Amino acid sequence: MATDLFDLTGKIALVSGASRGIGEEIAKLLARQGAHVIVSSRKIDDCTAVAETIREQGGGAEPFACNVGNMDDIAALFAHIHEAYGRLDICVNNAAANPYFGHVLDTDLGAFNKTVEVNIRGYFFMSVEAGKLMRDHGGGAIVNTASINALQPGPMQGIYSITKAAVVNMTKVFAKECAPLGIRCNALLPGLTRTRFA
């Protein structure tokens, strides 16, 4: 049941990386506050499980598989949102990749590309597509999950820390340019959290 202060009844929310961990909890919280949540992650079975749990608890949710490191997946996701709902009120960019743990000098191109594709390019174009829908319907909110590593890089987490620092600055760029459109953009910087990365 939604509380008056954070009543999101009638709002359409998208959460990426929502099949477990922080994203799953954000999706459940938004649903408890009344939003209809599009539960998105790479694997449809995992998305479906979270969406079913939300529905069992009385909330509204729909699963939709999307790898935010894949531009075609992002295009398909937003085409679906436009067709099914016609608008988007909340976008939580939470999907992340951290495939490499080791010295920065030993980072290989594959790990570099995967981390950048998801954590920077994915967040950027998810925000662009969300922002276009929000701009056309009076505004909305974009929330990016960064990391405390954006401010203080963790040991042996070089490329991950670099991408999360980029997310913080990206959020500032979108906040400044999209504020006149009624779109708020903010970042979360969680510390170490027990979860699994792709």
Question: What do the PLM-derived regions correspond to, one by one?
Answer:
Residues I12, S19-R20:
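Conserved glycine-rich cofactor-binding loop
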Residues I44, A65-L77, L109:
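The beta1-alpha1 cofactor-binding region of Rossmann-like NAD(H)/NADP(H)-dependent oxidoreductases
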Residues G102-V104, D108-N113, I142:
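Substrate-binding pocket helix/loop in short-chain dehydrogenase/reductase
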Residues T107, P153-S161, V173:
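Active-site loop-to-helix junction immediately N-terminal to the catalytic Tyr of the SDR YXXXK motif
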Residues S127, T163, T171:
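Active-site helix of classical SDR
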Residues K132, K176-P180:
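Alpha-helical segment proximal to the catalytic Tyr-Lys
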Residues S147:
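Residue(s) in the substrate-gating loop at a strand-loop-helix junction
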